[in-house]
Amino acid sequence: MDRPYDETVDIPDSEDIATPRLQQSLAENLDKLRDSYGDNSKLLTKTNSELANRSIKTASKSVIRMDSSSEKLCDRGSSDDDDDDDNDDDEDEDDDDDDENANIHDATEGVYNPADYEHLTVSSEIKEIFEYIQRYTPQTIELETKLKPFIPDYIPAVGDIDAFLKVPRPDGKPDYLGLLVLDEPCANQSDPTVLDLQLRALSKQTTTKQVTVKSLENAEHQTKAIENWIKSIADLYRTKPPPTVHYTKNMPEISQLMSEWPKSFEESISNMQLSLSQLDCSLKDYVDIICALLDIPVYNNRIHSLHLLFSLYLEFKNSQHFRQNESVIT
C-alpha cells in the first residue's frame, strides 16, 4: 500500500544543512517510470500527477518543519543572549558593590583625609611632616599562637563501697586491717597536766576546777621526769600573758610615774634623810605615805593603788637603763 511518508530532518544548533532539492528527485522518478512502462502515456501522466502532488506535499511539510526549527534556533539564540546580558548585569552590580564598599571603607570615621587640612596656613616643615602620614604603610605582623597546657583541677572520684571481702590469714587469726583504730605514741608526748594548765591560761578561766596532779613513784630514780616538769612549768609562766586589771578609778600611766622628779624635790628629800623603815605607823598609813611620794592616788579601796605600785616596781626592775646603772655602781 502506498502511504505518504513525511521526511523529517533534525537540525542541530551548530550545523547548517541545506534544504533538500525537490526537482532533482522528481526528474529521477520520471526517468525510472519511462524506462519501466515504455509508451503508455496515460499511465505516465497519471503517475506524473501523483508524483507531483506527493512531491508538493512533501516539500510543503519539509518547509514547515524548517520554519519551526529556525524559530526554535532563533528562540534559543535569543535566550542565550539574554543569559549573557544577565551575567553582564550581575558582574556590573558586583563591581558597583565593591566600589561602594571601598567608598564606605575610605569614609571610615577618624581616617586621615588631607583635603580637610589644605586650608590651613602652616609652614612647609609642618606640611612635610603631614606627608609622612600618607607615606606610611602598616606592616602585617602575624602573631604566634602559643599553646598553653590546660591542667584541670583534681576532682577525687568516689570509689566503690568496701564489701569487707578480705582474704583470711593463713594462720586463722582475725585480721583487723582497716577496722582497728591504733593510738600510736609520738616521740615527745605532752603532759596532760601541763596541757590543762596551758589551756586554762589561754582561756582565762576564773572558776576553779579539780585538777589531777601527777605523782611519781620512786621519784629519786626519775630525775629526768622531774626536770622536764620544772622546765614545762617555767615555760608556761614565761609565755603566760600578764593579767589585766580594770581600774574602777582613774589611775595614771606607768610611763608617767617613771618620769624624772624635779631637781628641787630630789634635793629636799636628800637633805631630809628620810628613813621610811623607822616610821612608827600602821600598814594603811605606810601605804598611803609611799603612794603619796610616788604620785599614786589612793581611794577607799587600796588594792588598785597597791597593784599600780607593784607594777611600777616591776617596770623599774626590768628596765635596762636601771640595770646598766646598777652594774656601773657595783
Curated annotation (Swiss-Prot):
Please indicate which superkingdom the organism of origin belongs to.
Eukaryota
- The answer, when asked if Cytoplasm is one of the entry's keywords, is yes
Sorted alphabetically, the keyword list is: Cell projection, Cilium, Cytoplasm, Cytoskeleton
Residue spans of biased composition, Acidic residues class: 7-16, 80-101
**UniProt-annotated stretches for the region Disordered:** 1-21, 55-112
Q: Tell me where it mainly resides.
A: cytoplasm
Q: Name one GO cellular component term.
A: cytoplasm
According to its UniProt record, what is one Pfam family this protein matches? IFT46_B_C
Q: Where in the cell is it found?
A: Cytoplasm, Cytoskeleton, Cilium basal body; Cell projection, Cilium
Q: Which GO terms describe its biological process?
A: cilium assembly; intraciliary transport
Is Cytoplasm among the key words of this record?
yes
Spans of biased composition, class Basic and acidic residues?
A: 68-79
User: Which PANTHER family does this chain map to?
Assistant: INTRAFLAGELLAR TRANSPORT PROTEIN 46 HOMOLOG
- State its role: Forms part of a complex involved in intraflagellar transport (IFT), the bi-directional movement of particles required for the assembly, maintenance and functioning of primary cilia.
- Protein family (similarity comment): Belongs to the IFT46 family.
Q: Provide the protein name.
A: Intraflagellar transport protein 46 homolog
Q: Which organism is it from?
A: Schistosoma japonicum (Blood fluke)
